[in-house]
Curated annotation (Swiss-Prot):
This is Probable glycine dehydrogenase (decarboxylating) subunit 1. The glycine cleavage system catalyzes the degradation of glycine. The P protein binds the alpha-amino group of glycine through its pyridoxal phosphate cofactor; CO(2) is released and the remaining methylamine moiety is then transferred to the lipoamide cofactor of the H protein. GO terms for molecular function: glycine dehydrogenase (decarboxylating) activity. It catalyses: N(6)-[(R)-lipoyl]-L-lysyl-[glycine-cleavage complex H protein] + glycine + H(+) = N(6)-[(R)-S(8)-aminomethyldihydrolipoyl]-L-lysyl-[glycine-cleavage complex H protein] + CO2. Belongs to the GcvP family. N-terminal subunit subfamily. InterPro entries: GcvPA, GDC-P_N, GDC_P, PyrdxlP-dep_Trfase, PyrdxlP-dep_Trfase_major, PyrdxlP-dep_Trfase_small.
């Protein structure tokens, strides 16, 4: 049942029926002494984030856990309730591909807007209608680079998300392409001298995290220049997409392909997924791009409509000619990101990104006061690595206090600087000053 508020005419008609002059007359039987003759003593209005923070404070009287300080590719962010409410609409509530445009205009238009958002944030010309996740998008970018250049070597930064690198290795195992991994330096950025040495005439692409797995904003322009000189493409992979509200777009820094995940927009952590992957590139590469594109067109009556176009996947064309076998993908998750980004707007996204960076700086200051130095000196967004002495022990200890600490870096990089004590920690808009101080104090104790 839909809710329609009463108009003044509706109220007047109802009062006339019961013989009352005004609404207050309906409460005449209540003694005056029992009526409230002053405004309610309520606190000032609060935005959703502050309201949820207060509700969490009240709920903390029970056995509960704080927003996790672990990121590592999947981040805790506030998801406005309206996102889930819109997803529940019958027109949208399916992850299935809108093959029949005549009955799927709403979904197709939403995917079209998703592509617009992806292009705006990445500085690219074209985007597809989403991928499974950031890892498969990265692997598909390497395959596309091989098709475009005709080369069989992929150079990857060791600071790229380890799980992205594993999926990439799985994809390229069957193609026979060589993967060369380049180390990172003391600042947490890709070692450019090693990159220069690794890139040659066989290199199809160079892949960097932006920001990378260590939370560091990598040297994307310099890496792109090295790749371009050798005739290779540059792929930027972004796991924390909120960073694109503050950092310069990958396309503006020389990247030829921008991939990653929009989990940070409209999608909860959900123990690691699902979350929509994005894929964007230059217009000249559009016919080599995997997946599907939602396009705008006009029908024979001249009316604007939306359709799937450039669907060069194995269900649509001959398998050996297909650019991808990506199927139903993460359409519903992409819709959630689209709704969230629509609510934020350009200014809201910039404010959210600045807030995330501010909280990360606050965490850095608190951890340094607690005696935990940052391991890497490179620029960061909302994630950093700290030396806490014994990362695994700290994680176990804080878990008993209801605090989900960061990710021990030694699980992926046993030979990294300060590996035993290295703890990868993220701070977002959900981590207020009190929680950050609580975390730093718990680590120190």
């Amino acid at each position: 049942m839909r809710y329609h508020p009463h108009t003044p005419d509706d109220v007047r008609a109802m009062l006339d029926v019961v013989g009352a002059e005004r609404v207050d007359d309906l409460f005449r039987s209540i003694p005056q002494a029992l009526r409230l003759d002053r405004p309610l003593d309520l606190p000032p209005a609060a935005d959703e984030i502050a309201l949820f923070s207060e509700l969490r404070r009240l709920a903390a009287r029970n056995e509960t856990a704080h927003p996790p300080f672990v990121g590592a590719g999947c981040y805790p962010h506030h998801v406005p309730p309206v996102v889930d409410q819109l997803l529940l609409r019958g027109e949208f509530f399916t992850a299935y591909t809108p093959y029949q445009p005549e009955i799927s205009q709403g979904t197709l238009q939403a995917l079209f807007e998703w592509q617009t958002f992806v292009c705006l944030l990445t500085g690219m010309d074209v985007s597809n209608a989403s991928m499974y996740d950031g890892a498969t998008a990265t692997a598909e970018a390497a395959l596309m680079a091989g098709r475009i250049t005709g080369r069989d070597k992929v150079v990857v930064s060791a600071a790229l998300h380890p799980e992205y690198r594993k999926v990439l290795a799985t994809y390229l195992r069957s193609t026979g392409d060589e993967i060369v991994t380049v180390p990172f330096g003391a600042d947490g950025r890709t070692d450019l001298a090693a990159l220069q040495q690794a890139v040659d005439g066989r290199t199809a692409c160079v892949i960097l995290g932006y920001p990378n797995f260590l939370g560091v904003v990598d040297a994307l322009p310099e890496a792109a220049a090295i790749a371009r000189k050798a005739g290779a493409l540059t792929v930027s992979a972004t796991a924390e997409a909120v960073s694109l509200g503050l950092l310069q777009a990958p396309g503006a820094l020389g990247a030829d392909v921008a991939v990653g995940t929009f989990q940070s927009f409209g999608n909860p952590m959900s123990f690691g997924g699902p979350a929509p992957g994005f894929f964007a590139t230059r217009e000249k590469h559009v016919r080599q791009m995997p997946g599907r594109v939602a396009g705008a067109t006009v029908d024979k009556q001249g009316r604007r409509g939306f359709v799937l176009t450039l669907s060069t996947r194995e269900q649509h064309i001959r398998r050996e000619k297909a650019t991808s076998n990506i199927c139903t993908n993460s359409g519903l998750c992409a819709l959630a990101s689209t709704v969230h980004l629509s609510l934020l707007g350009k200014r809201g996204l910039a404010e959210l990104a600045r807030l995330n960076h501010g909280r990360a700086r606050m965490l850095r200051d608190a951890m340094e006061r607690a005696g935990c130095r940052p391991v890497f000196s490179g620029p960061f967004f909302n994630e950093q690595v700290f030396d806490v002495g014994d990362a695994e022990a700290v994680v176990a200890k804080l878990a008993k206090r209801g605090i989900v600490a960061g990710a021990p870096l030694a699980r992926w990089f046993p030979d990294a600087p300060s590996a035993k004590g290295a703890l990868l920690c993220a701070a977002t808009e959900l981590h207020g000053p009190e929680l950050i101080q609580l975390f730093a104090g718990a680590v120190r104790s």
